[in-house]
A protein has these predicted regions:
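Basic, polyanion-interacting recognition surfaces, primarily
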Residues: 1-100
Length: 100
């Protein structure tokens, strides 16, 4: 379980349902399988510290759960829900490794 605060409430979320997390304007948005998107004031680095090894940072603004990795292209990847996310140049080989 992942415990976090969102809009003044302490919430828990099954880690296996997290598809990816995005930082936008210093706010963390966590997209899930079945819960929609939830918001927190956590940093992406703090979020990643609490996640297991199958979560990787693919870009300055994104962390993905590799269990939901559906496809890899040049400097982008596709996760569940057909969502295309950017991949940093330095992370391309890492993302490809998890895809294989």
């Amino acid at each position: 379980m992942f415990y976090f605060y969102s809009e003044g409430k302490k919430l828990r979320l099954p880690i296996k349902q997290i598809i990816y997390a995005e930082i936008l304007n210093h706010d963390l948005y966590i997209t899930t399988n079945g819960w929609g998107t939830v918001h927190s004031r956590m940093t992406l680095a703090a979020f990643l510290e609490k996640m297991p090894d199958n979560f990787i940072r693919i870009h300055h603004s994104y962390v993905i759960n590799t269990d939901y990795l559906m496809g890899v292209g040049y400097r982008e990847c596709t996760v569940a829900g057909n969502v295309v996310l950017p991949v940093a140049r330095g992370m391309q080989k890492t993302v490809e490794k998890y895809f294989m």
